[in-house]
């Protein structure tokens, strides 16, 4: 179904709004993916905080023109889907990587993160980024490690002193 001018403006406005909030963008070719496979991927995308949209390239170019993802315009050729990571930078990468393992018809074409265009191979790098929760857990571990080591050292010193006190305590003899 063809979109009229007002519908196209709404699509551009919606996509531009999503792009301003997104951490990263992956553009992928989806030719050969069935409707049921695409529906499953959209469901998976919703669950993982990824905005997934199939849109005409000309509309996408207009929507991304004033955002940090304008660098991706040169890669907008052929039938493409746009995966925006809304919750953490690696979410779209994990989605595309996982889905392309099962369905070889889905091929990533470009990655954009922080206003920089990366080749399609960087999807693996993006997918390997930890989630926000994992990153916070790693940070908490790094921050707690010095305190843990200090507590162990204090305990070792206290244990060592208690052993020395027990050994060197004078015996009282009552005769």
Swiss-Prot record:
Family matches, as InterPro entries: Ribosomal_uL10, Ribosomal_uL10-like_sf, Ribosomal_uL10_bac, Ribosomal_uL10_bac_type, Ribosomal_uL10_CS_bac
Keywords, ordered alphabetically: Ribonucleoprotein, Ribosomal protein, RNA-binding, rRNA-binding
Superkingdom of the source species: Bacteria
A GO term, aspect molecular function: structural constituent of ribosome
PROSITE patterns reported for this sequence: RIBOSOMAL_L10
TM annotation in the entry: none
Keyword Phosphoprotein: no
Single GO cellular component term: large ribosomal subunit
GO biological process, one term: translation
The keyword Hydrolase appears for this protein: no
Complex and partners: Part of the ribosomal stalk of the 50S ribosomal subunit. The N-terminus interacts with L11 and the large rRNA to form the base of the stalk. The C-terminus forms an elongated spine to which L12 dimers bind in a sequential fashion forming a multimeric L10(L12)X complex.
Protein family (similarity comment): Belongs to the universal ribosomal protein uL10 family.
Role noted for this protein: Forms part of the ribosomal stalk, playing a central role in the interaction of the ribosome with GTP-bound translation factors.
Official protein name in the record: Large ribosomal subunit protein uL10
Gene from which this protein is expressed: rplJ
């Amino acid at each position: 179904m063809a979109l009229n001018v007002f519908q196209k403006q709404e699509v551009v406005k919606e996509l531009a709004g999503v792009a301003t909030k997104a951490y990263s963008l992956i553009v992928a070719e989806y030719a050969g993916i069935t409707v049921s496979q695409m529906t499953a991927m959209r469901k998976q995308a919703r669950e993982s905080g990824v905005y997934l949209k199939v849109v005409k390239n000309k509309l996408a170019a207009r929507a991304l023109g004033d955002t940090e993802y304008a660098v991706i315009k040169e890669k907008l050729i052929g039938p493409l889907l746009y995966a925006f990571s809304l919750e953490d930078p690696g979410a779209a990468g994990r989605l595309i990587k996982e889905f392309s393992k099962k369905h070889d018809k889905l091929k990533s074409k470009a990655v954009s993160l922080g206003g920089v265009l990366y080749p399609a191979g960087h999807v693996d790098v993006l997918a390997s980024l930890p989630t926000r929760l994992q990153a916070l857990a790693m940070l908490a571990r790094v921050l707690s490690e010095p305190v843990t080591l200090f507590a162990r050292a204090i305990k070792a010193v206290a244990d060592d002193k208690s052993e020395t006190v027990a050994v060197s305590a004078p015996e009282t003899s009552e005769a």
